[in-house]
Amino acid sequence: MASLLTALILPLALLLLDAAKVLGSLSFRMSPTQKETRLGEKVELQCELLQSGMATGCSWLRHIPGDDPRPTFLMYLSAQRVKLAEGLDPRHISGAKVSGTKFQLTLSSFLQEDQGYYFCSVVSNSILYFSNFVPVFLPAKPATTPAMRPSSAAPTSAPQTRSVSPRSEVCRTSAGSAVDTSRLDFACNIYIWAPLVGTCGVLLLSLVITGICYRRNRRRVCKCPRPVVRQGGKPNLSEKYV
């Protein structure tokens, strides 16, 4: 009868869960409030009713994080009996009424699938009360980072202030030393000729652009033939160009 009653009130419990959290926090004391355990460890959770005469029995439930928001009924505890949900192994999960207002749930050997949020609920005067959630989980796995492979090269003691090209070192002479002209080959000449060639190229391009613009803007002279009027009043056809 108790399991049937619990199955009927579970849908209603989901709708009233948020509203009952305030009442539940004032009506229950959970011990511990959270639990971080390990595989194979024994886990004991206690639910204490703070209001005397609130109820004679208590139901334990578990909510597993995931897509399904419905909690899972685990057991119903009273002074007379312990009613486990179908499919649960009594050697793995058990419960008992410790005192008049304390109800205990015990997991003999914690498993991976036992992780979740545990809570208890009671019905008193047609009111459904829920306790706070007790998270029971395994320790979080630390994020593994790949180990850095040690470098085979020995670290340099003196840091370099700036990078200098080896070609520029060939063309540079130290202060007070004689200049060795035999070493000034093409590697040094390119530092001299490259800016000069670039400058000449820019000047030549500017000259070409200036010439093109001048030819386009030059004033056109009309070369149309016209007769020349002589003093006699008639044009001379032999002299028709000016």
UniProtKB/Swiss-Prot annotation:
| Keyword Transcription appears in the UniProt entry | no
Q: Where is the composition biased (Polar residues)?
A: 153-166
For region Disordered, the annotated ranges are: 147-166
Q: Which residues lie on this side of the membrane: Cytoplasmic?
A: 215-242
Give a GO cellular-component term.
external side of plasma membrane
Q: What residues form the membrane-spanning segments?
A: 190-214
Q: Which UniProt keywords apply?
A: Adaptive immunity, Cell membrane, Disulfide bond, Glycoprotein, Immunity, Immunoglobulin domain, Lipoprotein, Membrane, Palmitate, Signal, Transmembrane, Transmembrane helix
State where the protein is found.
Cell membrane
Q: Where is the lipid attached (S-palmitoyl cysteine)?
A: 213
The record places the following residue ranges in the Extracellular compartment, namely 26-189
UniProt PTM comment: Palmitoylated, but association with CD8B seems to be more important for the enrichment of CD8A in lipid rafts. O-glycosylated.
- This chain's protein is named T-cell surface glycoprotein CD8 alpha chain
* Signal sequence bounds: 1-25
Query: Which SMART domains would you find in this protein's record?
Result: IG, IGv
Checking PROSITE patterns in the record gives: IG_LIKE
Claim: S-adenosyl-L-methionine is one of the keywords in the record: no
Provide the membrane topology annotation: Single-pass type I membrane protein
Pfam families referenced in this protein's UniProt entry, alphabetically: V-set
Example GO BP: cytotoxic T cell differentiation
Q: Where is the Ig-like V-type domain?
A: 26-140
Subunit composition?
Forms disulfide-linked heterodimers with CD8B at the cell surface. Also forms homodimers in several cell types including NK-cells or peripheral blood T-lymphocytes. Interacts with the MHC class I HLA-A/B2M dimer. Interacts with LCK in a zinc-dependent manner.
Q: Check the record and name the PANTHER family matching this protein.
A: CD8 ALPHA CHAIN, T-CELL SURFACE GLYCOPROTEIN CD8 ALPHA CHAIN
- Function noted in UniProt: Integral membrane glycoprotein that plays an essential role in the immune response and serves multiple functions in responses against both external and internal offenses. In T-cells, functions primarily as a coreceptor for MHC class I molecule:peptide complex. The antigens presented by class I peptides are derived from cytosolic proteins while class II derived from extracellular proteins. Interacts simultaneously with the T-cell receptor (TCR) and the MHC class I proteins presented by antigen presenting cells (APCs). In turn, recruits the Src kinase LCK to the vicinity of the TCR-CD3 complex.
Q: What is its main location?
A: membrane
Source organism per entry reads Bos taurus (Bovine)
Which positions form S-S bridges? 47-120
